[in-house]
Amino acid sequence: MSIIQDAIAWIRDEITPQGRQWEEFYRNRWQHDKVVRSTHGVNCTGGCTWNIHVKDGIVTWEMQGLDYPLLEAGLPPYEPRGCQRGISFSWYLYSPLRVKYPYIRGALLDLWREARANHADPVAAWTSLVENPAARQRWQRARGKGGLRRTDWNTALEIISASMVSTIKKHGPDRIAGFSPIPAMSMISFASGARLMQLIGGASLSFYDWYCDLPTASPETWGEQTDVQESADWYHAKMLVSMGANIGMTRTPDCHFLAEGRHNGTKLWVFSPDFSMVAKYADEWVAVNTGQDGAWWMAVNHVLLTEFHHQKQTPYFMDYTKKFTDAPFLVEIKPAANGRVRPGQLLRAGRLQQYAKVEHGEWKFLMWDEADQKPKMPMGSSGDRWGTEKGKWNLLLKDGQDGSEIKPQLSFLEDHDAVVQVELDDFGAGGVCTRGVPVKTLTTANGKQVQVTTAYDLLMAQYGVNRGLPGEYPADYNDPNAPYTPAWSEKYTGIGRDVLIRFAREWGTTAEHTEGKCTILIGAGVNHWYHANLMYRAGIHALMFCGCIGKNGGGLAHYVGQEKLAPAEPWAAIAQAKDWFSPSRLQNAPSWHYVHSDQWRYEKDFTDYHTVPQNAGPDTTAKGHTMDMQVRAVRQGWLPFYPQFPENPLDVAKQARAAGADSPEKVASWVAKRLQNKEMKFSVEDPD
């Protein structure tokens, strides 16, 4: 009976209006009069679609969109997509801390009001402040101490405009530089500021490299900028490695592909010094010491080359290496300063008699043709990219001069004229090791003889793969003193050699059976280290040796700010004011800050910090100071730098006109001649 009475009481509570007033509050909380589609534009690559529920123009709540199209049959759906940062985005919109108005340093605002009271012209008012040492120090010393006051837009815009005009008149337009993060975050916002910079003659600073999101290994290796695969491709991989990429945190919308890939048979290795969010997804978590991923991969590559390229020549790997890498290219072996020999440059095609007259012969390279037993010049080098004859900038294994087929010979191990002891750098120990390398001798067009080997043979020697040649090669994997053996890696990585060997064999076997379905997920955890490019390239080697790049389920996947602009060309015309003039004034931000902030004063020569190549020739770039290299880069035209000259460039142009230079070409020639005669210098030569 009591149960029935309790039930009746409960029903009475449910239908009593007074007891259900809380429901009205709940309904009001989720009310909306429309739903709009949007995303959270906070420089996030995810770009997740969200349904934004709006009432009276106010965001009331948000819900993830669930209508992504399927990319292809067999792939899991894209949703769910979203993250904790996104779903709380409306908090930023309505936060009392959000800056909605211009703020100005109080000390500067007081000075500005005084100056405007005394000067009708805003430019004159600003000039009176900036040229008054006491006034200038007053607002500069207030920096970092708070004291910001809200002001109106007209005042803010007037100060900005007056300061820019004053700077241009006194010092020149290239004394003004503008910076904004990635344009893909907001193309219109970025373009408006960048266009202003270009139209007034200012410089636009780079962004991707400045905050260390650009993986320099990508342009160094492939000449592109983070053209990585779609994250759904993780599902195709049969072995995934995550290093320096905390996928659960930084790619939350995509991390479900990790879990789904494992259901599909993918094995996930995570290299992380701590048990990170992504480590919970791992089949194997390897706590590699911080900053030592490069040592891990170098030892892995030693195993891969030993077992999958030398002891067993895996057909797929060998074919891929011949077709898609520079391993078959011929490299000169040249005398070093100490009388020994060291690897030189790639042998230029133009140095041989048969190719002496080809266009851009200094920018075309050679392979050894296994069938004809002679050097041949494959298409696809830089010289073909800029040649007058089109259609040769490709990877077809054909001679660029006569069109004959090329069967690249990777190694001279079984067919050589001599074995020479080549000096190779051991940067870990700060010394050198001497190892035997098979070479052939060629006669150049001028009658000189030159010894050459293949890049592949040099790789084998550098990695210490014992192929029965004389020299300082390791006896086996357990040699702790020979660079790049599994035993050598232990003192850097903190991981036992048995784990590394097992990983390398799994990697190679997986790639062999799947034809390259091994992927490295990599990110800021590695990229923000000094020499990150070398850690990246060590991993890239493992991908190359096993034919993983360019394959579905394989490759290097760098996920830090790799957003791209879809309308890149038309957008650039607007943002860089190309509809008015070209070229634009663009400056790499790291150099700009390094020089102008006097960071260079706090550094010493390269050799005080780093192990550099031993016995390098007189033209080496591995000696000196970074600032010396920066000056050299500007003087030789490798890098732009602004401001260009100590003088106002407007005054320089006037002087050139007065000297009779009556066209832009003559002005440029006049300036170049004065630079050559040391009558002018670049501002980077005297940054203060």
List the model feature ranges, each with a label.
Residues 169-173, 186-187, 490-523, 534-540, ...:
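Gly/Pro-rich turn-and-neighbor structural signature
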Residues 61, 205, 310-318, 498-501, ...:
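Acidic/polar loop patches that form or flank catalytic/metal-binding clefts of enzymes
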Residues 665-668, 673-682, 687-688:
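Ordered core of a single globular domain
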